[in-house]
Curated annotation (Swiss-Prot):
Catalytic reaction(s) noted: 2-dehydro-3-deoxy-D-gluconate + ATP = 2-dehydro-3-deoxy-6-phospho-D-gluconate + ADP + H(+)
Assigned GO CC terms: cytosol
Residues involved in substrate binding: 28-32, 88, 102-104, 170, 264
Protein name: 2-dehydro-3-deoxygluconokinase
Residues the record lists as binding ATP: 168-170, 228-233, 261-264
Role of this protein: Catalyzes the phosphorylation of 2-keto-3-deoxygluconate (KDG) to produce 2-keto-3-deoxy-6-phosphogluconate (KDPG).
A Pfam family this chain is assigned to: PfkB
Gene Ontology biological process terms in this record: D-galacturonate catabolic process; D-glucuronate catabolic process; DNA damage response; phosphorylation
Amino acid sequence: MSKKIAVIGECMIELSEKGADVKRGFGGDTLNTSVYIARQVDPAALTVHYVTALGTDSFSQQMLDAWHGENVDTSLTQRMENRLPGLYYIETDSTGERTFYYWRNEAAAKFWLESEQSAAICEELANFDYLYLSGISLAILSPTSREKLLSLLRECRANGGKVIFDNNYRPRLWASKEETQQVYQQMLECTDIAFLTLDDEDALWGQQPVEDVIARTHNAGVKEVVVKRGADSCLVSIAGEGLVDVPAVKLPKEKVIDTTAAGDSFSAGYLAVRLTGGSAENAAKRGHLTASTVIQYRGAIIPREAMPA
């Protein structure tokens, strides 16, 4: 019987400059991960579900249609009257440096745990094999909704499920660094696999040797710690089994076009192997291969035919 992973988060409308024109697309860290997992697994082994809230507008419908086309199940995605998806604009200067502007305060995804359907959705999610979320999934919620989400994660683990967390830290989404540290600590205490981008760890906790970052995460109760270091090797530490250092795929500088979804796609490649019985080392190799392919194309979601074999 196929196992199930629910990816929890937010997808937004993306507006980006293309010469004198503005191009519209969709983007979101967890959505990127869900698509790249779905592209790399046999649905008979693992089905991918995306959990969020959208509006009843045409943009929301276009998102749903796109996700269906990627074999991402949306049966647990809510549609809310009088709500819309969030929006962000990417401005690119003459050197290629990007600046992001966000409009998301009233986005539907912020309220997915406050609806009449949320209790029934949580009841279903508590029986999933895997729940995946990121720091952004937590940041957009009210404190009350965060508590509900943490309760759901604990219940899922009590039922035999596993929780996967990507530390994706965006300071502008949080009231303070202290609040983030407190929430992340609670999150790690109910996490089985943690993906840590080292730059985000340094920004949130202060710069520390990577060994200390790994030890702190294990001490919170996380069994499997995956440290992402951009173009450098990744480190996988499994409690009781030791550390594996897996080299990245090296690309010539001119082949790197857009690093937008590098971390999201790495996590997807890793999980596509790991959650279907592969070793941590092979999972990390697949993560590197996926990320190194994705960054050779513009945009977060690359053409399906460009995916590695």
